[in-house]
UniProtKB/Swiss-Prot annotation:
Residues 1-611 are cytoplasmic. Activated by calcium. The gene is MIRO2. This is Mitochondrial Rho GTPase 2. One of its GO terms (cellular component) is mitochondrial outer membrane.
Amino acid sequence: MMLGGKSSAGGRTSLRVAVAGDKGTGKSSLISAVASETFPDNVPRVLPPITLPADAFPDYIPITIVDTPSSIDNRIKLIEEFRKADVVLLTYACDQPSTLDRLSSYWLPELRRLEIKAPVIVVGCKLDLRDERSPARLEDIMSPIMKEYREIETCIECSALTLIQVPDVFYFASKAVLHPTFPLFDQEKQCLKPRLRRAVQRIFNLCDHDLDGALNDAELNDFQVNCFGAPLDPVELMGVKKVVQERQPDGVTDLGLTLPGFLFLFSLFIERGRPETAWAILRKCGYNDSLELHAELLPVPAKQSPDQSIELTNEAMDFLSGIFQLYDLDNDGALQPAELDDLFQTAPDSPWLEDPYKEAAEKTPGGSLTINGFLSEWALMTLLDPRKSLANLTYIGYGHDPASTFSVTRKRSVDRKKQRTERNVFQCFVFGPKKSGKSALLDSFLGRKFSNSYKATMGERYAANVIDQPGGSKKTLILREIPEDRVKKFLTNKESLAACDVAVVVYDSSDVYSWRKAREILMEVARRGEERGYGTPCLLVAAKDDLDPYPMSVQESDRVCMELGIDIPVSLSMKLGEPNSLFSRIVSTAENPHMSIPETESGRRSRNIRQLVNSSLLFVSVGTAVGFAGLAAYRAYSARKNA
């Protein structure tokens, strides 16, 4: 199983606690009492920060406690401390019910308004002054408040005068940060949260070496040793299984502890107030506080140049093809949403439920993901976020060395010089004016029907699919739509074209404005590529070929292409049919990275000057070499004559 995770404290080396509340609720006395272990006779209104030593609590982490002012005049200081805090203690006085009311009428809403994400501990101070005639229990009082404000981790009452539960306040504060219950357990539904269930299921699968769906005694002991450093004796093992079987009948079978039983153990840890046990297991298995694998466990190769890209190796692609077939239970060549959910059931979330992946791949009319769509999604995720790709591969059971997962492509500048490329994944930027047909092109690429209704693309959009090339080879093509209103800003980035294998500029062949804007974009792409050394092959696409072209459109576009040295526009209509030949042509263009690169007049002059300079240098070099050779021959002749 994957070990080498963080310590039980999640890798933290310090903790900062902000103590806040109404004036006179006992904030400063509480801090002074925990620091000195005595009740202070005289306490200043606001104490300076105090640090408790690392050995004060079991996790061996120093805790800095910050007192905060209650007055409105110091509001800026208070907000600053809230933002810096790892945990917030909100105090009220047990002998002043109005201060308890102020928690829900002011302090808790204020923390939400400020978007403070730190957990909250509610602390009742001056317990020694509570009116003993009041029958209300703390649980009864706080239960409705905690239901409304889920950020409250726990509530506790204490007395600085008698030192009752004073250390416990800060123990619970550290526990709320280092071993929080909130990410693990849904208090309202009284069940484990989905992310924890997914992580626990993955850990169970890693421990189930014989894949029989249960953990036998040997597997349970391996798990115990890996996480806690010591095995359980037979009596302890029997005791664990007995507790599980009493509360979760399907948690134990003749084969051992089942997944429901394993999940029940985590519920039991939390029920008994021991979330630190659950966190110790999670962190030992590499999980962070968000219940995701730590980045340090997910090494990805570094690109040395922006015109390189990262691809999955054949080994990783073979694994993905196999996992697709494993979860395609009905063998229809596509994963239904339920089958895809099952595939990612051991990942924190399904990675393709959000942009840019949500609508980026080919699906069947019923909404199932095809094998091409499945592999294309992985190629897209690897291109955009290789660490996320590796994480999700790991979640679903890929156990190979990360070094065999990815390959870093050669620089495109080198590909141009060698006039060939070894890439399997190509990225094409799709530029063009509004309403030119960019989105329709991407829809067609994914096999979607043409729609007459226009919907502007608000952000960048991706579409990925597998293209069958002549000779039987398969390449993955990723189209990236760049909205017109983002082109200018996009191209100001010096490395904007580094990742682009082919730039496609789409225009409405029936609209003169659309053509002029497309020409402007094409010239800008060409100019930027020349300036920055990222010369990009370009294709012009004359869309909406089913409409009447504007006069002189063909002649103008052909002339511009001839001047730039690129192919004449590809005419097509997404309305009349799928432009599959265009996508194959884009891939073919990408496979010949030295061709179809537009050259402006300025670029042509620069090239001529470079050639002239190089020729001059060559002439001078040759002349110099001839001169030296002649001098050497003369000296040799003179030497022989004198001899």
